[in-house]
Amino acid sequence: MADKTDIISSSSDKASPPPPSAFRNYLSSGSKEPVLLLESAGKESCCIFRVPESFVALNPKAYKPKVVSIGPYHYGEKHLQMIQQHKPRLLQLFLDEAKKKDVEENVLVKAVVDLEDKIRKSYSEELKTGHDLMFMMVLDGCFILMVFLIMSGNIELSEDPIFSIPWLLSSIQSDLLLLENQVPFFVLQTLYVGSKIGVSSDLNRIAFHFFKNPIDKEGSYWEKHRNYKAKHLLDLIRETFLPNTSESDKASSPHVQVQLHEGKSGNVPSVDSKAVPLILSAKRLRLQGIKFRLRRSKEDSILNVRLKKNKLQIPQLRFDGFISSFFLNCVAFEQFYTDSSNEITTYIVFMGCLLNNEEDVTFLRNDKLIIENHFGSNNEVSEFFKTISKDVVFEVDTSYLNNVFKGVNEYTKKWYNGLWAGFRHTHFESPWTFLSSCAVLFVILLTMLQSTVAILSYLNDKKGNGNAAPPPLGLP
C-alpha cells in the first residue's frame, strides 16, 4: 500500500486531480504481499488458522510450539531446530517400514503432491509456491506417524532420545495440539494407508494411544471416537472431549450471540434482553443454595456438567500445562473454523463464571475435589479462566450448557432458597458451627424455661397471698 508519508501532507498542499488509473494503482500497490486471510478461509475446507495477535497478547506462549514445528507456519524457527534435525531419521525409518510392504518413496511423495490444491485450501493464509510445501507435508506427516507407531508399540525403537527423555516427549504432545502447528488429517491418512503399514481405521487408535497419558482416560473413553473423521490432530482430540448431548437437551431460545467483556466482578455478558444470563461464582452460588457434587467417571468427558434440582454435578478437572494449552487452542479453533461447534468455549465460559477469584478455586479444589490443580496457584487458575473468557463469542441457543445456565439462574432467583441456604451456611456449615448453634439454642431454651418458671412461680405466690387470712389487728 502507499507509504504513510505519501498520504499525510500539510493542509496547504493543493493536490491536482488524479489520473483515471491512480485509484486502481493504489489498490494494487500491496497485491504482491502474501494474502494473510484467503477468501477460502470461510469455507468448510479451511481448518488451520494463524492465531491473531489479540489472542496471542493474552497468552503469549500458548500458541507457539516449544520443540517441534509441524506444517508451514513455524517452519525454520531457530529454537525448533533440535527436533527438525531428527525428522529425516524418523522419515527414513518410516520409509524402511513401507519398503517392507513393497511401497517406494516416490509413491508416497506423489500421493501427497496430488493433494496439493486440497492441502493449500486447508490453510487460512497464502503459502509459498512450489513443491517445498508438499515435501514438508511428507516429512512432517511421516514424523508424526512414526512417533505414533513407536509409542503404540507397533514399531520397536529402543533408547531413542525423543522417546526416552520425558520432558521432550511431553513437549511434543503439547506441540502436536497447537492450532498453528497442524497438517491436514487426510495427509496423515494418505501416508499411513499408502505405506500399507496400517489401515485407515487404526490411525485414530494410535493417535489416541499417544495422547492418553496426559488426558488420563480409560480405553473405552477413546473407543467410541475411533471412526471420527477429523480435520487435524487438534480436532481429533477435541472431539473426544465433547459430551454426548441429545437434541432434546438443547434450548429452543432465539438465536443470540454472547460476547464477554471484563467488568468489576469478572466477565459479564453484553447481550440483548432475550439472552440467557451467565451465572454467579461458586462461592456465591453456594450461598444461594446451589450444591456442588463431584461427578466421578473415568469414561466421562470433563464437559459432562449436569444440574439436578439444586445439585450441580461437575466431573473432575485435572488442570495442568497440557490441558491449559489444549483449551486455548480449542477455543481458537472453535472461534475461527466456520463448521465447528462451541462446546469447549462454552465450558470455558462456564468455569470462568464459577472461578471468579482465588476463593472459588479453593472451594472447588479443597472442599469438593472438583479441581485437581497442577497448573499453579489458585489465583493463577482463576486468572486463566477469566482471561481466556475475554472477547469470545458463542451462540447461546446451541450451547450445550444452556439448560444448566437457565436452571441455576431460575433457582437462585427465588429469594427463599438463598435465605434458607444462608441460614444453613451460617449455623450448620461445620460440626463446630453446628455445636455452637446448638449451644446457643440450648442457652436460649434454658433462659426461656427459667423465665417461664419464674413467671409461674410469681403468679402462684400472688394467688396464694390473695387467699390468705388477714393478720390480727394491732399486729404487723
UniProtKB/Swiss-Prot annotation:
Its main location: membrane. Keywords: Membrane, Transmembrane, Transmembrane helix. GO terms for cellular component: plasma membrane. Residues 1-24 are annotated as: Disordered. Disulfide bonds: none annotated. It is a multi-pass membrane protein. The chain crosses the membrane at residues 133-153, 439-459. It is found in: Membrane. InterPro entries: DUF247_pln. Pfam families: DUF247. PANTHER family: BNAC04G53230D PROTEIN (PTHR31170), PTHR31170:SF21. Belongs to the UPF0481 family. This is UPF0481 protein At3g47200. It comes from Arabidopsis thaliana (Mouse-ear cress).
